[in-house]
Amino acid sequence: MPRSAQETERIRERELRIVRTARQIAEQDGWSAVTVRRLADAIGVSQPILYRHFPGGRDEIVERVVIDGYTELAAAMRVPGDGADTLPALVAAYLAFAREHPAVYEAMASARTGIVFASSETPAILREGFGMLERAVGGESDRDRAVRAELLWSTLHGISQFAAHDRLDAALDDVREDAVAALFARHP
């Protein structure tokens, strides 16, 4: 029997609440604190109800957080301009996202999920975000653009990780962002 629109919306709202609660727990206490039991208790449902929404349990919830995180990051990186003109704002948006959402960024960077990267099976939102990096750094060929985008992504990730662990001087954030943008600016 088909679900009513009201039932479908109720299910969607509960799933959003589960994911939002997982993010809150992770931001407060780290990902190791995110368990099915704690999530069920926090939102006031039984564990079987939670599994009904996410049959893969915690792993499926974390994967959803990762996809949502990449969706939010892509939205943040949609900056005005085209190509290399977007590089400074894109660098700033990426680093701000990682700084403002440390637990989500941690999951995006290191959680073991079923998400496939650098493949035709990569989710569209991840390909879109990577495409923004490719267009910003440019290159003489598809391969050159992909490598330059991977290097930019790796650089931004490294900065994000060092900053998250207080290994960089926060007073230099703007200078660092400008330096990364200049480093990856296209050269004729």
Where on the chain are the PLM-derived regions?
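N-terminal intrinsically disordered/low-complexity leader segments
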Residues: 1-13
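Generic hydrophobic, amphipathic alpha-helix propensity
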Residues: 14-22, 39, 65-73
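Helix-turn-helix
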Residues: 17, 21, 25-60
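Amphipathic alpha-helical linker/stalk segments
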Residues: 65-89, 118-127, 133
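Helical hydrophobic small-molecule/effector-binding pocket
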Residues: 88-109, 118-121
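Amphipathic alpha-helical packing segments from all-alpha helical-bundle domains
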Residues: 109, 115-151, 173-185
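Amphipathic C-terminal alpha-helical segment
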Residues: 153-170, 185-188
